[in-house]
Amino acid sequence: QALRQLVRNFTDPRVGCVSGLYRLGDPHDLRGQGEGLYWRYETFIKRQESRLHSILGAHGALYAIRKSLFQPLTETSINDDYLIPMRIVEQGYRSVYEPAAVAWEREVASVEGEFARRRRIAAGNCQQTVELLRMLSPLRGGVAVSFFSHKVLRTVAPLFMVALLISSVWGPTPWAAAALILQAMLYGSAAVGYLCQRRGWTVRWLSAPL
């Protein structure tokens, strides 16, 4: 059924890639709660990107492309489920979202495994941002807007967070002190959530920062 939902989008000759909806984890598990919140956010973003022009990347668990548009990747490429769809978009085709096609992954990795996965994704984000900077061309229209807001800003966000932390420590104003307290609460919650997960404890409100 999911495959039928995917391929129906290819009746539009402008569509070169279709991504399905990805659902992950046990909602009763701490990691699943945090991941569920993250994927709900990602789903909203992808819906809007698809309406604007094209989504950035695809869910590796379930997506389809036109065979004629595939371009081989190098051995050093990370996150092929992002690069393959983006190269199709580069060729002038759309990459769209099909929420009626659903892929479920019920098991969530350990905290250590999840951290390793996200570290790999972050490394891929850096690689892809550099490799696809040409997508920022104004000639790309909505794709350029999506690429800047969804990929470039996300890649450099850790640098902004470090700069914010440093400026909050050295800033003499009440606003800087308030920002420092909020950051300490956020990072502290993530650390406590990590420790709770290692001990097998579930604390729902700690799932988001983790």
Task: Identify what each model region corresponds to.
Residues G57-P72, Y93:
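Conserved nucleotide-sugar donor-binding
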Residues E105, R154-L210:
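Membrane-embedded multi-pass helical conduit in multi-pass membrane proteins
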Residues Q1-T11:
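Short alpha-helix within the catalytic core of nucleotide-sugar-dependent glycosyltransferases
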Residues F10-Y41, T76-D80, I84-H150, A208:
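Catalytic donor/gating beta->alpha subdomain of glycosyltransferases that bind UDP-sugars
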Residues S68-F70, V102, V152:
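Short, well-ordered alpha-helical scaffold segment located
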Residues Q48, L52, K151, T155-L159:
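Loop-to-transmembrane-helix entry motif
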